[in-house]
Amino acid sequence: MIGQWNNGTGRRKSSVARVFLKKGSGKITINGKDIQSYFGRETSIMIARQPLALTNHVETFDIRINVYGGGESGQAGAARHGITRALIDYDAALKPALSQAGFVTRDAREVERKKVGLHSARRAKQFSKR
């Protein structure tokens, strides 16, 4: 399996995606389901496919993705990051174009923790003058 598959691990928020790609017809499977049935929103599907569209490999690879943690948006971002890394593993010449588009860099933004004495991470209790 390792010989014919290229792999990459992508992360976004609290989601982690392990991506495996090989030459094929363009079928993307996430956790055993087709990408159309796994992601409800068209934007999530578009986000996950961005690196393939940029490098003109939309119908070149069959992709298998195992993703866990987080929500739909985070999982789509993790899948995009993983596909990017797998494409670089396949052909290092694609890295400059993917890097220029900002797909290689891991988006380090995480949810800020809630602090004691506040409603949320930054929202303070309502001030009462009297």
Swiss-Prot record:
It holds the Pfam family Ribosomal_S9. One of its GO terms (biological process) is translation. One of its GO terms (molecular function) is RNA binding. InterPro entries: Ribosomal_Su5_D2-typ_SF (IPR020568), Ribosomal_uS9 (IPR000754), Ribosomal_uS9_bac/plastid (IPR023035), Ribosomal_uS9_CS (IPR020574), Ribsml_uS5_D2-typ_fold_subgr (IPR014721). The keyword Ribonucleoprotein applies. Keywords: Ribonucleoprotein, Ribosomal protein. It comes from the Bacteria. GO terms for cellular component: cytosolic small ribosomal subunit. The keyword Ribonucleoprotein applies. PANTHER family: RIBOSOMAL PROTEIN S9 (PTHR21569), SMALL RIBOSOMAL SUBUNIT PROTEIN US9M (PTHR21569:SF1). HAMAP family: Ribosomal_uS9_B (MF_00532_B). Belongs to the universal ribosomal protein uS9 family. This is Small ribosomal subunit protein uS9. It comes from Verminephrobacter eiseniae (strain EF01-2). The gene is rpsI.
